Amino acid sequence: MLKRDMTIANYDPQLWQAITDETRRQEEHIELIASENYTSPRVMEAQGSQLTNKYAEGYPAKRYYGGCEYVDVVETLAIERAKELFGATYANVQPHSGSQANSAVYMALLQPGDTVLGMNLAHGGHLTHGSPVNFSGKLYNIIPYGIDESGKIDYDEMERLAVEHKPKMMIGGFSAYSGIVDWARMREIADKIGAWLFVDMAHVAGLIAAGVYPNPVPHAHVVTSTTHKTLAGPRGGLILSAADDEDLYKKLNSAVFPGGQGGPLMHVIAGKAVAFKEALEPEFKTYQAQVVKNAKAMAATFIERGYKIVSGGTDNHLMLVDLIGRELTGKEADAALGKANITVNKNSVPNDPRSPFVTSGVRIGTPAITRRGFKEAESIHLTNWICDVLDNHDNDEVLANTREKVLDICRRFPVYA
């Protein structure tokens, strides 16, 4: 018989220890991975609810199982809040991840072998935008576009490629690009050749919801996102559109279920509903504005300390520190900062001579530190500590001293007070 007082700690101490250790790591380390964030206790409460027990194949009021009257309420709340948040007329909250949301778009709009124009992974794109190791690169004819010498997207080259290759779909969005994307220009190019415009806004969804980054929903035929990252919700995916095209909406729904998934994760959808409600609050706008302020402060400090930032700065939540020409790889920088309790990820940079497993750069983002309460002053201090470590990556004393500074600031700015 199941009892409410059953706990992991009493039943599985080995697993509980790993959970406890990870909780401590999150509190004692500064998180700068651009795709990570801290979700609210309310979201975690939803994810730990009895909604996890319910199968609900189909969509609200069109289920294949009985007993769905309450999960219909949950999913409808998530759908309506997502539409309100991004100005959409359609939302599908069932994708289990951003990648699965993206695969549903491919399935809905394309046939295998169709030509797709997507951002080069080496220039800041994403695996699902056409990488040869991903389903997108294996099933479709991918034409990559990239950035120019200034580190900005080259729209003239994008248009030239579009006219030459006439892709059936163009993809906007990125995983490591620090500029503002001109969604309207991309739609003009797509319309010129009669292509679908699909935008993956996963990295900047929170900024977009808060109005501090341009919204692609009015311009694209279809938009996808994750619900974590800057949006600070549970791990999951989302599909949106404002195309007022019921045929398109039906194709997208069918591509998610039954095309790519079975039963939705109702406990996660409840978490999404909570996160969307939180993102509609005024304080969320204040938070996202601070995310960008902190990123700009960090980028400026890196440059002052002699480090190169791809694109020369940032207009969003992330930046790429370019280590080409230095006697330090991205992998080594990642490891050295880890010893100082600062978590980043190694990342390839444009024209990187090193392999993706080594790289010549690190990607840094500010959503998580801003969630802790960091403002510009703390962000500048942190950047100087990072530069101290990078300048002295083989000096154990510098790493130890930096670690103590990190532990002190983490105590002053806890994740969960």
From Swiss-Prot:
Q: Name the species this protein comes from.
A: Aeromonas salmonicida (strain A449)
List the InterPro entries hit by this protein, alphabetically.
PyrdxlP-dep_Trfase, PyrdxlP-dep_Trfase_major, PyrdxlP-dep_Trfase_small, Ser_HO-MeTrfase, Ser_HO-MeTrfase-like, Ser_HO-MeTrfase_PLP_BS, SHMT-like_dom
The UniProt subunit note reads as follows: Homodimer.
Any single GO BP term: glycine biosynthetic process from serine
Obligatory cofactor(s) = pyridoxal 5'-phosphate
Q: What SUPFAM superfamilies does the entry give? A: PLP-dependent transferases
Q: What is the protein named?
A: Serine hydroxymethyltransferase
Q: Which Pfam families match?
A: SHMT (PF00464)
